[in-house]
Structures are given as structure tokens and as C-alpha cells.
Amino acid sequence: MKNCAWKESGNLCIIGKEYKEEKTMDILKNENIKNAAAVLWHKFLLAETVNDIILSEIKDRLYLQNVDEDWLMSPETSPRDTFMARITDLAFGDVVEEAVTSLYENKEALLPYSDLTETKDPGRLYDLMMETVMEQLICQDGSTVKKNPYYEQIHISPDKENCIALATADYLPYEFFQTFPRYKKENPFLYGEAGFFKERMTFPVILENNRVWMSVVPSEIRSMEKDIEVAKGKVITYGLGLGYYAFMASEKEEAESVTIVEMNCDVISLFKRNILPQFPNKEKIRIIEADAFAFIEKQEDGIYDTAFSDFWSDVDDGLDLYLRFMAKTARFAKTKHSYWIETCFMEYFFRPVLIRVLMEQITEKKIIMPEVSGRIRKVQNRFKTYLKTKNDRITSPEELTLLFTNESMISLMRDFAVKNPMRP
């Protein structure tokens, strides 16, 4: 996870002096374009600050203790005194206040994020950040999870195979957890989203050396909705986990069969022994013990109708795997491929590069962003170089905005992955 953008450290962002760089895109630099770019830039700064606040707090396992539910559920007195506003204030009020204070007191050190202070006084900036945080929070309905077909059908009993264990974990009441982000047209840079339940919720997990490796939680469920929706015919999935995708795909009448490619024999053993027997349509399931990269090399186009890749655990460990595997699947025309949390890779690592490149070209100033790991920085630098090969012409604010849509960004990412293959 990135360093908090609003905290002073040696890794913070500055805007350098003017510099000359090879043009990336042909941008018409009229006032309308410049104004639209400035609006996008401030949306980015606000979003990155809010993303870091939410995700940093969740990483520390944020939860509200001794909650006064009578007060929380009491009649709302104004738009600023709602249930969600009270939750937001309890959970994030102090850290947002700290962030705003830091932005005003350490402007030089916190550039470019302190640009947010140019047009707003501290009170208004605090309100704006709190409103944005609140929009990123979701009170989850536990009944919707419990009514999920997988939860209704699959019951987990503790079991172990070498260092891999099948178990359950839980969320405490009012414990915040990261959820799968919803695209927001009004601010495409927002991806830090958190949910909570009012009740204790239990969910299945796979542990590796006593640490959670895989789980079926609300974020996982929502992250696969579109991929499950398009599953039909002969389906193949690379990565088994707890079998959520395989289960949901096998439940569809449109799915003739579901082939699972998994290289971990212990995960396969636990699944076959504990989970697969509970599948209503277990006869549709076929498991192949193999490495996904080795398997895809020999796979013929059209043997399967739908393919889904999910053999990484999160955005950090998955970035290289996604880019490498996506490039391997680009040759398929008949088999339709999708990739777990592809939009998250876009939001975390690629969309920020595009806005940075755009602003550097328009302002002719170098923008230095917070340090990330060397591996991620290498990918981002290669993506920045790749953008220089694009001949897009931007002549209106509308065209500028379209660059940052999910469709446009995913197209860029996939083209980048194919033209700049990653090494193992």
C-alpha cells in the first residue's frame, strides 16, 4: 500500500521546474482543455488523499467499539446528521482533521496534494473530504450475503493439508473492510471504498501458514459479478481458491462445463474433500492440476467459450501475473477472457500515471509522485514510455474525460501488456 499522501515524509510529492519532454499525446492547449485538466487534477488529488486515508485505516483493522446504537439510529436532524454521517465522523473524523491540518501547515512538503488548499478554506476542505469519505462507505446488509447461493449451499468445516488449512474468520460489528470499488463518473480516481456490518459475520477462508490467503467476502463476491454474468458454454477458470467462481458458474444453465486449472495440490485436495461434494452441479466440474502459464501456452482457441483468470491474491502480488497472463491470452479470438480485479490494477497503478503524464504535458512541469515499490515503479515507468507511442489527439474537454473511463483505460492496459511483455 502507498504511503499516506497527506503525511509528511521523504517520499512526498513535489512539482519541479519547467522541463521539456517528448510529447505523449497531441493535446490542443486552449483554455477549455486547460480548465478541464485542472478540474481532473484536483479530483485526482482529493481522491488520492481520501483513498489513502480509508485504506490506511482499514489496514490497521479499524472498528468502532462500544457503539451507542440508540444514538446512531436516533432520528436524523439534518442532512449532516444522518446515520452514515455519524458513522463517518466516529471512524474518520479525527484522521481527516489531521490530514487537513497537515495540508495547510506543510504546503511545501505536501505538494502537489496541498494544491487542494488553494481554493478552499480549512473548514470547507474538511467538509469536502468528509463528504467524500462518507460516499465511499457502505453499510452492508448481512442478509444479502447469507442469501448468496454459495453461502446457502457451502458449509465449511475445519480441515488441513500440509501448510494449507480450511477455516472460517469473521468481521466484528462495525469493523471496516475494503470493498470492491464502484466506478464513479464524477470522480474516476476514487477507489478506496469500505463497508461494515451491524452484526458479526462469518466467512470461509483458506489459510497458508496460519495467514489468510483466500476468502469469500463481500468484496470477492462483488468483484466477480460481471465475470459470472458472462460465463456460458464451456467455461475455464485459472485458479481454484474456495471455488466461488466455479460454483456460481456451474449453477448457470448456460454453463455446460467448468474446468479449473490449479497448481496447488493441497488446495485441490481440500476442495475435493470438503467443498466439491456440496456442489449441486458437481458433474460439471473438472479439475486439472497444472500451472496456468504452462497450460495457456498449449490451449487452443475455441476449446472453451469463457475464460476467467484468478490466481493472484491482491493487486500487489497480482500486477505482474495479470500483465504476463493477459499478454498470453491476447491471441484468443473465440475464447472470451476476463481477469479478476482488472479494474483495480487500472485504478491503483495505471490511471494515476495517465493523469500525471497529462498534467506534465499541459503544465510543462515535472510531477513527482509518492514512492512505490521498485517493481511497481518499473511497470509504471514502462507504461509512461508506452504512452509516448500513442498518437491520440485531444481537442475537447469531452475527449479528455473519455481518456479516463474504464473502457479506455482497460484498452490501454491490455495493449500495453501485449506490446511490452513482462518477464517472469
Question: Regions from the language model: what does each represent?
Answer:
Residues 11-17, 21:
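Short, positively charged and aromatic/hydrophobic N-terminal segments
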Residues 26-195:
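N-terminal auxiliary segments of SAM/dcSAM-dependent transferases
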Residues 217-229, 234-276, 290:
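SAM cofactor-binding core of SAM-dependent methyltransferases
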Residues 248-249, 298-300, 321-328:
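A short acidic, amphipathic alpha-helical/loop segment
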Residues 270-302:
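S-adenosyl-L-methionine
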Residues 302-311:
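Short SAM/SAH-binding signature in class I
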Residues 313-416:
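C-terminal substrate-binding/active-site "lid" region of AdoMet-derived donor-dependent transferases
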